[in-house]
Regions:
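Acidic, metal-coordinating catalytic segment for phosphate/diphosphate chemistry
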Residues: 18-51, 55
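Conserved Nudix-box catalytic region and its N-terminal flanking loop in Nudix hydrolases
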Residues: 54-97
């Protein structure tokens, strides 16, 4: 079956992928998925995040050990946009996954681009930040995810935390 990976010459077939200029000539190079990931040195990641306020407090989430180099730092809830997903829908989905809260996006308050090295790769992050309103749900912690705790903080409290750049923007 055809997938979006066909267009870039990486042909899915079971757990083995092929990298070849001609999609019909799979003899050039045969790679496992792990090997294919290792040769990718430039990554663009588009994410959507929410600023959630409760009176004078902002909701922040602590990054887990699944985020090497940033574990223990605090950030805004949110995450990667899936292929074909609208940014606002991604923010709603990611916030609920990480916090248990259902939110309504109100307005985009920031969109920016950041380039840095992460995990031995050149990473280009494009982030869309929404002001969002809590519409329901109950605050809980994500299990086995990129965050392990979420908590409401006043601006003064948040400034004492180890924050990633996105967390600093949120306060």
């Amino acid at each position: 079956s055809s997938t979006s990976l066909d267009k870039c010459g990486i042909m899915p077939r079971d757990k083995t992928h092929y990298l070849a200029p001609d999609q019909n000539d799979r003899s050039k190079l045969r790679l496992t998925l792990r090997q294919a990931r290792e040769i990718i040195v430039e990554v663009t990641r588009i994410g959507a995040y929410g600023i959630l306020m409760d009176e004078n407090r902002v909701l922040l989430c602590r990054l887990s050990s699944q985020v090497p180099g940033f574990a223990g730092n605090w950030t805004l809830p949110g995450g990667g946009i899936e292929f074909g997903e609208q940014p606002a829908d991604a923010m709603v989905r990611e916030v609920e996954e990480e916090t248990g809260l259902r939110v309504i996006p109100k307005v985009i308050v920031d969109a920016h681009s950041l380039q840095r090295e992460f995990g031995g790769r050149n990473m280009h992050s494009i982030r869309i930040v929404y002001l969002a309103e809590v519409a329901g749900g109950e605050l809980r912690f994500e299990q086995d995810g990129t965050t392990d705790r979420c908590q409401w903080f006043t601006e003064e409290e948040a400034r004492t935390l180890p924050l990633v750049e996105l967390g600093k923007e949120g306060i």
